[in-house]
């Protein structure tokens, strides 16, 4: 009798261990948004070598079947149709097991990544509020189609199969934990397109760009020690490749329409001179992993901030160096955009790296997404940026791209422009907007510099200019040599 009971107990234990093996990836579940009009990956785990069948409620085709590998990993590709606010389900079954993802919407999905200014939630933090967040949070339930998932912070020295995260609907209880930039982008895009929008937020405050790059890219960087990835002596924020492996690689399996990137503060003193090269390489790597070489890649310019205030022990002009590198990268990366933020810092935020104006960033990202990804190329979504500079009767004539309709009128002196002579000593310049049939230019002069050879605009850690394009967007800060600028632009 005892032997029979023991055998029965062992059998029950064996069955219990085998039960419950079927599961979706953490990123696949209730409330998710799937990218419309494409094939999306659904993946998870099951018993090794088990057959898994996946059925989507919107599909008119037969269920899709896959076989788990030796580790129990499985994945299938499902075809999605046009966007809809009608809730759907995805069901996976294997043997007697079944798992269901409910309240699934089909629409547009974007990946947000970077460091703390992307991670910063709509609810804000201690001493770091988000301007206008109370109204947004209180009224957030109106955005029925907006969903958000935060990828849990994790570190790994090898690419991971899965990452932790749970999709959330948008309401006053959940929206305070959404990425603020991601929230404003998603809600505006959802209204503009009248489709559901999902945001995948994979961010880590303080992280350097090297943490988001793979070993394949970093092994050729002489200043990067890959051994630091597993070192206990190095802060996680500065460890190479660990976030790429643990957070991005799993997220890259999820079909998305584009990428939003807000990072660079931590590279102010680390590899700032090669930041454009690394960002360009990273964008190509991410696109390769996602499986779309032309996916829109939108970069947020660093907001004005006094990096030299003693907190970092740096000299002035480290901030503008990275901004310049961001601009270079935006021109090197195909189908990319740079959202200018020079006007989005108040004077009292001079030493606050988490500036409060996040709504405008999300909205400007939305405008560029509409232009690059959704068939509205004539939308004036891009910031005026430097094109050329020439010398004319002792004055510097500066031309701009993305300023076809000129600049907004001002009742005050234009500020932010400086010119320098051969000695390299910059002086504030008087600026006048000149309009002609050839286009709109800015004419710069000062008696202090009779023979200017260099020009710059807001090329400091914290300097907020006041000249904006007719579209209301600020000029991208720049520096250039007057004699060579026109040749370089050709």
Task: Describe each model-derived feature in a short phrase.
Residues 10-18:
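Hydrophobic h-region of N-terminal signal peptides that target proteins for export
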Residues 1-4:
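Positively charged n-region of N-terminal signal peptides that target proteins for export
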Residues 20-490:
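Cell-envelope and extracellular/periplasmic
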Residues 6-9, 259:
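Primarily membrane-embedded glycan-assembly and transfer machineries that use lipid-linked glycans
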């Amino acid at each position: 009798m005892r032997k029979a009971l023991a055998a029965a107990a062992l059998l029950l234990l064996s069955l219990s261990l085998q039960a419950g093996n079927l599961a979706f990836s953490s990123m696949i579940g209730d409330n998710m948004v799937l990218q419309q009009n494409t094939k999306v990956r659904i993946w998870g785990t099951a018993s090794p070598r088990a057959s898994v069948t996946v059925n989507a409620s919107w599909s008119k085709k037969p269920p899709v079947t896959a076989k788990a590998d030796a580790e129990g990993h499985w994945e299938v590709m499902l075809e999605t149709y046009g966007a809809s606010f009608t809730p759907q389900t995805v069901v996976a079954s294997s043997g007697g097991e079944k798992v269901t993802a409910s309240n699934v919407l089909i629409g547009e999905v974007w990946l947000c990544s970077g460091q703390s200014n992307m991670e910063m939630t709509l609810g804000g933090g201690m001493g770091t509020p988000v301007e206008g967040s109370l109204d947004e949070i209180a009224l957030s339930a109106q955005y029925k189609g907006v969903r958000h998932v935060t990828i849990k912070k994790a570190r790994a020295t090898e690419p991971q199969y899965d990452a932790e995260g749970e999709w959330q609907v948008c309401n006053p209880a959940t929206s305070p934990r959404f990425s603020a930039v991601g929230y404003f982008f998603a809600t505006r895009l959802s209204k503009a397109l009248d489709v559901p929008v999902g945001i995948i937020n994979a961010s880590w405050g303080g992280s350097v760009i090297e943490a988001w790059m793979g070993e394949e890219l970093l092994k050729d960087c002489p200043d990067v020690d890959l051994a630091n990835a597993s070192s206990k002596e190095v802060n996680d924020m500065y460890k190479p490749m660990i976030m790429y492996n643990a957070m991005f690689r799993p997220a890259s399996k999820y079909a998305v329409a584009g990428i939003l990137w807000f990072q660079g503060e931590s590279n102010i003193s680390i590899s700032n001179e090669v930041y454009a090269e690394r960002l360009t390489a990273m964008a190509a790597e991410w696109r390769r992993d996602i499986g779309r070489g032309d996916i829109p890649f939108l970069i947020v310019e660093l907001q004005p901030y006094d990096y030299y205030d003693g907190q970092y022990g740096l000299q002035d002009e480290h901030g503008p160096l990275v901004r310049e590198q961001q601009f270079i990268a935006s021109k090197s990366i195909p189908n990319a955009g740079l959202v200018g933020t020079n006007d989005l810092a108040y004077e009292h935020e001079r030493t606050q790296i988490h500036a409060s104006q996040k709504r405008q960033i999300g909205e400007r990202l939305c405008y560029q997404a509409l232009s690059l990804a959704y068939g509205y190329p004539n939308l004036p979504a891009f910031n005026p940026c430097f094109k050329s500079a020439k010398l004319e009767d002792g004055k510097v004539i500066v031309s701009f791209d993305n300023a076809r309709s000129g600049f907004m009128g001002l009742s005050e002196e234009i500020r932010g422009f400086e010119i320098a002579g051969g000695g390299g000593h910059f002086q504030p310049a008087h600026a006048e907007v000149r309009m002609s049939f050839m286009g709109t230019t800015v004419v710069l002069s000062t008696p202090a510099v009779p023979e200017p050879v260099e020009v710059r605009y807001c090329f400091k850690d914290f300097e907020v200019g006041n000249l904006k394009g007719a579209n209301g967007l600020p000029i991208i800060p720049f520096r250039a040599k007057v004699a060579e600028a026109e040749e370089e632009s050709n």
